[in-house]
């Protein structure tokens, strides 16, 4: 029986490719007896509110038709925090951010009661201004602009982690894994692109490996108890 996995999020998820081939390859290598269908519903500039919308309603992204949860009935949902986009609201939006995630959790359980819900926080952004050629949206902005954006991204990612722990949900914390690697001497730039935000190929591998490890561990645990 095919295991359908759907990924929701912003451009951090969209960068995992459509379909997410690195994740698909890792899952197949780790679970050769299983068949997987992976759908990447990550869309750039998505806020948590739009994840909530897409769980309930059909959505078109270019030529990609994204079906609502009652139609999909996946085995697993990977729900990325969207912290970077919601962080534009700064202090005024923090309570709304966690309220929306409460609604996402409730909606996921309601519309896909048999699905496993996996919550994802990705690699932190860089506080430094990006390379000029990669800096299209904030061309020639001062370093204080990037420091401020990074500051609020950090706060929103941390708030998401706090929320996930408080709710007792399944959390894949790539941010923490990268911080541990940084402490051991590997710079964050090893995993992020020249824009200082999105994952480069090594980052895609890092995020995909963390998701695959979580899903494969659950498959193994389920097999041992049946």
What residue ranges belong to the model's regions?
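Extracellular cell-wall/glycan-interacting regions and their flexible linkers
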Residues: 1, 225-226
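Serine-esterase "nucleophile elbow" of acetyl-processing enzymes
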Residues: 1-44, 49, 67-71, 77
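Short, solvent-exposed loop/turn segments at secondary-structure boundaries
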Residues: 18, 51-53, 89-94
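Alpha-helical cap/lid subdomain in secreted, periplasmic
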Residues: 25, 58-224
């Amino acid at each position: 029986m095919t295991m359908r996995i759907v990924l929701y999020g912003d451009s951090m998820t969209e960068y995992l490719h459509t379909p997410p081939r690195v994740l698909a390859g890792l899952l197949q290598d780790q679970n050769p007896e299983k068949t997987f269908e992976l759908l990447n519903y990550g869309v750039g500039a998505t806020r948590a509110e739009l994840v909530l919308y897409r769980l309930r309603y059909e959505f078109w992204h270019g030529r990609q038709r994204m079906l609502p949860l009652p139609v999909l009935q996946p085995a697993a949902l990977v729900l990325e925090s969207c912290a970077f986009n919601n962080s534009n609201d700064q202090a005024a939006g923090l309570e709304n951010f966690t309220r929306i995630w409460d609604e996402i959790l409730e909606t996921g359980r309601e519309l896909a009661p048999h699905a496993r819900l996996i919550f994802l926080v990705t690699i932190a952004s860089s506080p430094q201004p990006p390379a000029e050629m990669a800096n299209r949206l904030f061309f020639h902005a001062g370093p204080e602009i990037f420091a401020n954006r990074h500051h609020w991204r950090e706060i929103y990612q941390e708030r998401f982690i706090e929320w996930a722990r408080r709710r007792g949900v399944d959390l894949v914390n790539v941010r923490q894994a990268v911080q541990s690697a940084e402490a051991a001497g590997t710079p964050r730039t090893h995993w992020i692109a020249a824009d200082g935000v999105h994952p480069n190929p090594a980052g895609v591998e890092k995020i995909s490996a963390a998701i695959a490890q979580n899903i494969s561990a659950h498959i193994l645990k389920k097999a041992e108890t049946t």
